[in-house]
Amino acid sequence: MASKRRLRIAGYNINGINSRLNVLTRWLEEFQPDIVGLQELKCTDEGFPIDAIEALGYSAIWRGQPPRSWNGVALLSKVGEPVETRRALPGDPNLEQSRYIEAAICGILIGNVYAPNGNPWPGPKFDYKLAWMDALHAHAQDLLDSKVPAILIGDYNVIPTDMDVYKPERWKTDALFAPAAKQKYRELVAQGWTDAIRHFHPDERVYTFWPYWRNSFERDAGIRIDHALLSPALAKKLKGAGVDRTPRGWEKTSDHAPMWVEVEV
């Protein structure tokens, strides 16, 4: 009988991969994740620092976004080449924006999510956010119907509940905390997905993002907008989940911290 092993899968909004490359490579060396979904690359396809990634033993697939180099998503793996299955979310109302990439790695289908911010709310950007989440719902249901072990990990740009924010009253007018956005997230989870952080930390205030201003990180004035949702076939193999706050305290770092799950395969 083949021995089982644990895989650590992380999601990290790097907020500019080239400007934070030292942060990323240091974190990869120290935390040693097996698979990583990166969001907000802010680079073109040609500008992705593949040499630095490969030097640390990772293979990668990515999709940048020209010409202004916003958005961008990538999947890194040191446990086998990612077999790309999608470079965009089916039904995305704006396919020019790089917000989703998907691959099979070690028998797991990994969808890397970078949902629209949606601000200002109300307005066309918020309308796009809701339409994008509708497309995610449809694809997520297809994944569940397929019965494959799957994870949708990344920056959802949704604060699900009051427990996921330091001071809810300060976010009442923000698209990340809008009732319609929260409802979309609840409906997604209700399809049958497991929110990994809440599975292990049901009553704790766990944050993944702290604004740069007003010493938010030092005061732990954060929000939880980065999530990992696991299909039933993978959730039964879930062994742990958390947030690595360490790199958020480094110099010239992202305003997000990486969140992670461990699964046994």
Q: What residue spans do the PLM features occupy?
A:
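Glycine-rich, phosphate-binding/catalytic loops in enzymes
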Residues: 26-28, 52-56, 127-129, 168-171
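Soluble or luminal CAZymes and related metallo-dependent hydrolases
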Residues: 16-20, 95, 128-136, 177-180, ...
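Surface-exposed cleft-lining segments at the edges of enzyme active sites
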Residues: 90-91, 116-133, 169-174
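Active-site beta-strand/loop signature of hydrolases that rely on acidic residues for catalysis
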Residues: 9-13, 28-46, 110, 139-162, ...
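Structured beta-strand-rich core segments of catalytic domains in phosphoester-bond hydrolases
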Residues: 41-44, 50-120
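Internal catalytic-core helix/loop-beta-alpha segment
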Residues: 87, 130-144
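N-terminal, active-site-proximal structural segment of metallo-dependent hydrolase catalytic domains
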Residues: 1-55, 62-73
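Metal-dependent phosphoester-hydrolase catalytic domains
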Residues: 45-47, 85-92, 162-265
